[in-house]
Amino acid sequence: MYWESAMKKSAAFTLIEILVTISIIALLTMIGVTNFRVANQKARDGRRQGDLEQIKAALELYRTDQGKYPIGASLPATIESATTVYMNEVPDDPVAAQTYYFSSDGETYTLCAGLELGTDIVNGCGSCGVTCNYKVTSPL
């Protein structure tokens, strides 16, 4: 008789065991979601930096052929001359609310982006939709 009642008690989980288990699962889930969010931000920042380097390469090719950079206060849809296409489609920021800032007087240019994980504010940039904190300029 005693043996049967002891078996019945140990066959179930106590309320404390269930609460501890749920708490551990919740904590691990929160850590996983936070790490996933940061990984996505890093990926978008890497894409922004890569995009600006690609635009820079196209602008340098344009200058080599044309003797100057394209003049303007915004990025054109394509970077091309009358005879050569240097970049078929200028990439957009991965976040729709943000843009890449571009300014050129023909002799120099400035490209800027707002990194999600960057904290330094860069001077000489216009509006990226957020605070610009990554800058690429023409070689001097």
Question: Can you say where each PLM-predicted feature lies in the sequence?
Answer:
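Short, surface-exposed interaction loops/tails
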Residues: 106-140
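Aliphatic-rich helix starts adjacent to a transmembrane/signal segment
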Residues: 33-53
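Extracellular/periplasmic head regions of type IV pilus-like filament subunits
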Residues: 57-117
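N-terminal single-pass transmembrane signal-anchor helix
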Residues: 8-36
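Regular, well-ordered alpha-helical segments
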Residues: 30, 38-41, 57, 61-64
